[in-house]
């Protein structure tokens, strides 16, 4: 079964139907199992090759987390591209592929609130949507919790169909598309989180809304741009792999390819009221702390190499908090709040020195700020915060 990073169910299913036979290729289903033959991990994509007696299915997930394009990086859309071929020298029989995304993708847990189904159609795609009937944006923070506001989209390229699927009291989106021999079909998952974070009392929109975009508008772009985006992702992955192999060998390269999406996706991107970048991390099962300095420091080499402006976006919340009257100490905070609410530390309200890590966090802040200054060849950021 598919799940959230906390281990709680978030149901995605994939069904491949040939005649009356149904095969499951994604998530837990009642269909016949397909045999997994190959897995390939690249920086922005993971590709699976599966087989049934009648066909070979190639399934590729792509999240285009390219740091040289912040609008694309922030776009909350993941592609699922599927291709089928006949086996044993026989042509592919008539067949259909279906993806299902259920209400657990927009709730903390199944049945938490009633959900509302909708549809969106645009040039190049059709999408089904699910959203909680209770929309309390940024209503809570925590660790073992999942977003229960906003709206999830499951989209399929033009020629496909979307519909509401109901099983008992649970609702889901189902997207279907007929397959032809060797011809790729494209699906996409998207999420509108409405607001990204609360930043010292102010709700901030996600970066992808910077140009007044909507998810339907982004889906139109995403489907139209897929061939070039997929090409860019592959080129970047090949470059990263070659550079990593040159300095650390095959095993090191494999680790970097495996880690890329995990490291980058652990953040949300937005801007503060002054238009400065914020790149906010969330700790996993460690109080859910946001903008944690001892997360920023070890992850910074990736961003120093590929987009040092994002390192400044990681540091800004800590400097902002440390310079405010709310921070009583003469050393660096460990974090700026509990994701997605960056309103100051939640443990002891940031007032108990026993909860702090002054040597570690001051060292982390000094070294990371110095490294970003060198990477950008610019003293402006460091000079702005020199009094600290």
For each feature predicted by the language model, list its residue ranges.
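Short, solvent-exposed loop/turn segments enriched in Ser/Thr/Gly
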Residues: 74-79
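An acidic intrinsically disordered interaction segment
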Residues: 38-53, 252-271, 329-334, 383-387
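Acidic/polar, glycine-enriched structural segments that form the non-catalytic walls/loops
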Residues: 65-72, 83-291, 312, 319-320, ...
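An extended acidic
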Residues: 1-53, 140-163
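Aromatic-rich carbohydrate-recognition surfaces in CAZymes
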Residues: 181, 214-226, 288-388
């Amino acid at each position: 079964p598919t799940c959230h990073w906390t281990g709680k169910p978030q149901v995605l299913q994939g069904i491949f139907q040939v005649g009356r036979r149904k095969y499951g290729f994604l998530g837990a289903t009642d269909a016949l199992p397909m045999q997994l033959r190959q897995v390939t991990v690249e920086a922005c994509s993971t590709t699976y090759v599966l087989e049934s007696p009648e066909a070979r299915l190639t399934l590729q997930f792509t999240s285009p987390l390219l740091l040289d394009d912040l609008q694309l990086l922030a776009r909350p859309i993941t592609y699922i591209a599927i291709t089928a071929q006949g086996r044993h020298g026989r042509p592919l029989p008539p067949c259909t592929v279906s993806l299902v995304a259920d209400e657990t993708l927009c709730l903390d847990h199944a049945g938490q609130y009633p959900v509302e189904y909708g549809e969106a159609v645009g040039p190049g795609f059709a999408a089904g949507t699910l959203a909680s009937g209770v929309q309390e944006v940024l209503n809570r923070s925590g660790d073992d919790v999942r977003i229960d506001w906003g709206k999830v989209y499951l989209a399929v390229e033009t020629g496909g169909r979307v519909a509401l699927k109901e099983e008992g009291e649970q609702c889901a989106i189902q997207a279907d598309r007929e397959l032809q021999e060797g011809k790729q079909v494209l699906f996409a998952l998207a999420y509108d989180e409405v607001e990204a974070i609360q930043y010292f009392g102010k709700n901030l929109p996600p970066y992808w809304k910077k140009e007044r975009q909507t998810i339907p508008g982004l889906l139109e772009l995403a489907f139209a741009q897929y061939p070039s985006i997929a090409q860019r992702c592959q080129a970047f992955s090949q470059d990263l792999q070659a550079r990593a192999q040159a300095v650390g060998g095959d095993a090191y390269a494999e680790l970097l390819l495996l880690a890329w999406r995990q490291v980058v996706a652990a953040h949300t991107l937005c801007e503060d009221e002054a238009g400065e970048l914020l790149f906010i991390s969330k700790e996993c099962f460690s109080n859910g702390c946001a903008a944690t300095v001892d997360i920023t420091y070890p992850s910074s080499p990736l961003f120093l190499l590929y987009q040092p402006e994002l390192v400044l976006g990681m540091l800004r919340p800590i400097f902002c908090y440390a310079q405010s009257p709310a921070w009583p100490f003469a050393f660096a905070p460990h974090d700026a709040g509990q994701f997605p609410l960056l309103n100051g530390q939640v443990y002891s309200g940031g007032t108990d020195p026993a909860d702090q890590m002054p040597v570690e966090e001051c060292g982390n802040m000094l070294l990371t700020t110095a490294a970003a200054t060198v990477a950008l060849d610019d003293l402006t950021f460091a000079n702005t915060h020199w009094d600290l």
